[in-house]
Amino acid sequence: MTEVLYGLDAAERARVAALRAEGRFFWLDTSLSETSREDLVDTLGIPERALSALRTAPHGYASRAFHADGESVVFALRCYAELEPVEEQAGYRLRPMEVQVLVTSDYLLTLHDERVSLPAVLAPDLPPGRSKGYVVYSVLDAMLATTSDALDEVELKLDTLVAAWTEGDGGGVPRATLRQAGARLATMRRWVRNEQAIFERVGLETGALRDFGTSEEPYFDRLEDQVDRLLTSIDAAANAMGMVLDLQLNERAYVLSVVATIFVPLTFITGFFGMNFGWMVDQVDSAVAFWLLGFVIPIATAALLWRLLVRPFIKGDPR
């Protein structure tokens, strides 16, 4: 069974040395906030070319951080975990974290800045007796699964907004929430598209590593298919958000058109009062008549029209 290690304290270093002496493949996950790259080199004997690739900042274009030299494969991915909340992603439980991955014939290394145990977050299925290629596939598959979970979070947020909007009083959808969802989907799509290019090479390059062989099942082809499905799902979620915006804009245009029709009779009313102003002054000979004709009757008429005609027209006939 593949052994999984987290961190690089004295006990873990001794265990790594023992596993390497026995020729057993293992997965080591560690945080750069707890371990230095020099410690990794001393413990794992990372090749110089792979170390240079690991030193490349994973931010920006993840596909540019890809490195393969026949002895190691280095690339950067993104997964989602429950991390400390940040202001621009308030309301979401899962936060993105960038992970640098190093695959050699002896071990799998995952490196990140956050103090979090990736094996505990991903909990991949690593049954005994499976090949090295399957171990790498299982870890990468679990990382992609967290992206699916994060996408589900966005879709559930949109579903909640639509339900609250349709079942409530027709109030507008919060713009801040839509902006957060749109930004999250855009960032997610950019990273998944980069990962699509990465996974097209990972299967080929890892197959060239010692003891990985070429007779493996097409595990990495499954990852490519999964990335394609993720891109399709992200685009569908973005389209759904666009539909929410369209519905909200249509409702606002609908209300504005109704309000605009209310002002159409004003031309007739002002013209009538202007042409008959002298007659009205002669007829209004008491304070009661002034209040009735000037305030009570117009207000009552407007309220009645609103209640019987305008409001049902805006809200829709419940029958």
Which residue ranges define each predicted feature?
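A short hydrophobic/aromatic micro-motif that marks alpha-helical segments and, especially, helix-coil
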Residues: 62, 204, 210-211, 280-282
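Residue-level signature of transmembrane alpha-helix interfaces in integral membrane proteins
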Residues: 122, 205, 247, 254, ...
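Peripheral, non-transmembrane regulatory/ligand-interaction domains of membrane transport proteins
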Residues: 1-204, 222, 311-319
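Alpha-helical transmembrane anchor segments
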Residues: 266-319
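Alpha-helical transmembrane segments
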Residues: 140, 147, 230, 298-306
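Membrane-associated alpha-helical segments
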Residues: 106, 143, 169-273
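Surface-exposed loop/turn and secondary-structure junction residues enriched for glycine/proline
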Residues: 57, 69, 125, 168-169, ...
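Short helix-coil transition/hinge motifs at the ends and kinks of transmembrane helices
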Residues: 83-91, 209-214, 281
